[in-house]
Each structure stands twice: as C-alpha cells, then as structure tokens.
C-alpha cells in the first residue's frame, strides 16, 4: 500500500495531523493483528461477506470478548476487496480527529481522493462542504470500498454521527460501512433496516459451535471427549474469550472433568 506522508486538516483553528510514519496514528488505520490462537471460521467469514455484499451498513454487536474484531480481521485478511480500517477511541468524538482518520484510512487502502476534497479539508472538517465532497468522491468509487469502524460504541457525539449518516446516505454503492460495537449503535439504523440496507450480526451469530470450539482447543493441544467438549461449549455459550481462557486452564489442569464442573456459566462473562 502506498504511503501518503502527513495529511493535515484544520478544525476550529487547530491543526489535526495523521502521519503515516507515526506508529500511534498508523495503528489507528490498520487492521489489528489476528491472535495466534484464532481459528479460521468459514461460517462467520461467509456471513460477513454476504452481508457486506448486499447491505450498505453491517453492524456487529456483542459484549467484550465475543470475537467481533477478530472475525472482522479474519474476513479482511481474506482479500475481500478494498478495505479501510479505523480503530476508534473517545477522541473520535471530535469531528477533526474522526474525519482525519477516515480520510487517512481511505487513502491507505488505495482510494484516490480528489483535490476538491483537500480544499474542503482546509475548511471546517466535518462541515457541510467537506461531507459533500467526501460523499461525492466515494459515490464515484468503483469497485466500492468497505470502511470498518471498530468500537463504534465509543462514538457518541451527535455531530460526528450525523455526519457519518449523511455520508453513508449519499454515497450510493461506492461505500460499504461495517461497524463493531459493544452496544446498539447510535446511528439511525432503523432507516437502513426499513430500506433493507442493514445487516445485523449478534453475539448468537459469533458464538462458537461445538466443532469450532474443538478446533480452538486443538490449537492449544487440549484433548477433550465429545461430552466434555459439548459441556464446555454449553457452559461458555460459545463465548470466544471464555473458551480461550478455559483452553489455557486445561493445559495445566490434571482433571478436565473437575475443571468443567467448577466452570461458571458463561465462564464468568
């Protein structure tokens, strides 16, 4: 991927910069590393791929540790096309910060943005002219780009959310938005649901099946009987973090049955 140096924008008289050679900034616009213990889950990868193909907005909602980010990273690594990734934090509630990272992520993914957008960025980032220019640029994108916003629940500022909704409603087929969140999104998802443009992936979809749990434990070198594996999957309800913690514990536990009996429901989720 190309390196684009520093992208600077002005917001309320202050400069916001995204530097490609800044490791902190670079981490914000890069897909996180997939954990070494993560197992391939074709069922989930296919589900995400189909949702992104047919819907403009895909929201992956589940509690911590359910595997949202890992599932999206595995899908993104499967070469689904042009993918831009933004790891959100509380600072994203400042329009200048949020849109700086979005633009940097789009450029890093290979999307060419017109000079008119650069001119708009010298104005008030997040203002109408900037959003209009960004939406117009993305509407012309062919093939479409998928923008992943990880940890969307951290975005609570109405101005940022309204701007994101505006762009999404005016890009046609040029943009697909995929968001992971611990809570239901503050975006007006009902509008996309009514239009048939919303796909929702929940904790129940991300839950490991018994077979998938077996693959995870096999990676750790743990061997359970079919009954023990079913018990573990049932007690953790397929919760990814719980299964991982149980697998680590099994490595050092001499009696799997005793460990399984002591395991609380949902592994203390």
Predicted features and spans:
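Long, basic/Gly/Ser/Thr-rich N-terminal segments
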Residues: 1-9
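Conserved adenine-nucleotide phosphate-binding loops and their immediately adjacent elements
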Residues: 12-48, 115-119, 215
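Walker A (P-loop) ATP-phosphate-binding motif of ABC ATPase nucleotide-binding domains
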Residues: 57
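Loop-to-helix "switch" segment enriched in basic
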Residues: 20-21, 138, 183, 193-194, ...
